Amino acid sequence: MSLYSDRTAEDHLCDRGRPTACLFGDQVEYEAELGLDFWPEAPRMRRIHLDLFTDDRSLAFSVDAPLRKPALAVDQRLKFSAGLREVRRRGAKVVIGPVDVDDLDRLAASHDLVVVTAGNNSLAGLFERDQVRSVHSEPQRSLFMMNVHGYDMAARPEHREGVFSFLPGTLEMFWVPFHDKDVGESRSLVVEATPGGRADRFGDVTSADEGLEVLKAVVDELFPHESAFLRPARPTSPVTWIKGQVVPVVRRPVAVLPSGRHVLGLGDAVVLNDPLAGQGANNATRMARFFAEELAGHDGPFTAPWLAERFDEWWEHGRYTNDFSNGLLAPLTEEQRTVMLAASRREDVGEQLWEGFNDPSSLFPWFFDAAATREFLARRNVGRLDVLRYKLGVGANLLTQKASRLVKRPVGGTATP
């Protein structure tokens, strides 16, 4: 086996920050089974705390529930660097240098199979867009990510685990326990802003310090209860930040080269989701595991039709990842809000909801189909009167928050609640 990379192990360590790439339970266990769990000191995420806000910055409700298996986010610069060294240690040939279509053609002639897992500029357009399986043609969120340390954990102990802050229609923000290359335990902050909305302010950011200042301003305005936690934070390094947009796409898994030979695509090269559902690295890991088992058990040649059939077989389960990711990009339905509201009162419902990050198929159909949602809640003895009681509690809480802000207004002046 040969692995071709345009960067050395040291190049990866010196690279800019990479996406957060939080792996959930089954994928963490699979890496461990492969002997790739090199960072036992990295913080594990065992719970997720979600705050759902209204447009006037009021907290509607919170969901706090355990994950069935711990999640783990390790700096990809560490993982890619260690991975290259480990592949070589296990006997594979590692070749450093750029690879273009002509190189792929040459490699396809001398190897049983060539697998492409990167979509760099020289290979752009190699895999054809699947018009049926691709839902979006434009970015659905403006993205910003940075790693920070020096935050005030005492101000918000919830951040010992994962925290999600949602303002539907405006901003989703993820505060992820993270193992950073330079400082170790830190937090990776992932911002998903609705394009053109109040939180879409990162397009002109040119540095980590500038990005953090913009982020603090957004948090002060939209999630002020997080301000004390974030105020003393600083970037883990000048390069651990990313901004941009993603157009979710599914591509055909087999590309035909000019010679007529073919290559297989895996991971983001063929299935690229918006990071909102945290499925990029998880989806790539599931796909790699499936194809590793299929390829190892196949005695014949790896023909293009056979590879396409295997992808279709994988898609029977893999499509749930896309449906989950695209579903979260859409506005929350009334039934989904009801599930989340029930989860704020029932930890078992929250645990089932969080399991979707580990196994998206576990959310179907009950989280995306109204009738199935009602059946799901009924099986857990959450009836209409329970939901009504939950909603009345939320309403009373919102009124209390508004009254509190009115009381805090200065006499003889004006203030914005």
Predicted segment positions?
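Flavin (FAD/FMN) cofactor-binding core of flavoprotein oxidoreductases
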Residues: 49-50, 232-250
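Conserved N-terminal helical subregion
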Residues: 40-130
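N-terminal Rossmann-like FAD-binding beta1-loop-alpha1 element of flavoenzymes
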Residues: 1-7
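Conserved mid-domain beta->alpha element of the FAD-binding
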Residues: 244-323
